[in-house]
């Protein structure tokens, strides 16, 4: 059984959580920083949801306690602070870190 934690701050993150929730031998915990994000994730069957901002210490505690196989960072591309905290907490706990990035878009004008 793979235990995954997905920080789902984008629509791609929610799509990933939905897809993972349908896979065999996969348990998913989805983290959102806001109540609204949590409500969207709670619509996906079989997913544990955390709808609150986690600081680095809280992330470390969660990763240790749950023993995730992987942590997926699907936060917004410009959310560098949270990405840094997730990376550090993963490194400190020996948890595999994966980053899901959307393609950059160009703005003309």
Where are these regions (language model features)?
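Extreme N-terminal starter segment of soluble prokaryotic enzymes
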Residues: 1-4
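Conserved N-terminal Rossmann-fold NAD(P)-binding element of oxidoreductases
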Residues: 6-8
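Residues in the short beta-alpha loop(s) of Rossmann-like NAD(P)-binding domains
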Residues: 10, 32-36, 103
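Short N-terminal binding/cap micro-motifs at the start of the first secondary-structure element
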Residues: 12-16, 37-40
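A short, Lys/Arg-enriched amphipathic alpha-helix followed by its capping loop at the start of a domain
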Residues: 16-26
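N-terminal beta-loop-helix "entrance" segment that forms/cooperates
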Residues: 29-53, 108-109
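Structural motif corresponding to alpha-helix initiation and N-cap regions
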Residues: 56-57
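Glycine/small-residue-rich loop that forms an oxyanion/phosphate-binding "nest" at active or ligand-binding sites
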Residues: 60-109
């Amino acid at each position: 059984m793979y235990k995954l934690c997905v920080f789902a701050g984008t629509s791609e993150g929610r799509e990933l959580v939905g897809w993972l929730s349908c896979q065999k031998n996969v348990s998913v915990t989805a983290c959102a920083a806001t109540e609204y994000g949590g409500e969207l994730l709670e619509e996906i069957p079989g997913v544990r949801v955390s709808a609150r901002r986690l600081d680095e210490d809280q992330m470390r505690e969660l990763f240790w306690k749950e023993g995730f196989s992987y942590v997926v960072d699907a936060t917004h591309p410009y959310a560098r602070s949270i990405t840094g905290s997730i990376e550090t907490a993963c490194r400190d706990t020996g948890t595999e870190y994966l980053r899901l990035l959307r393609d950059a878009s160009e703005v003309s004008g």
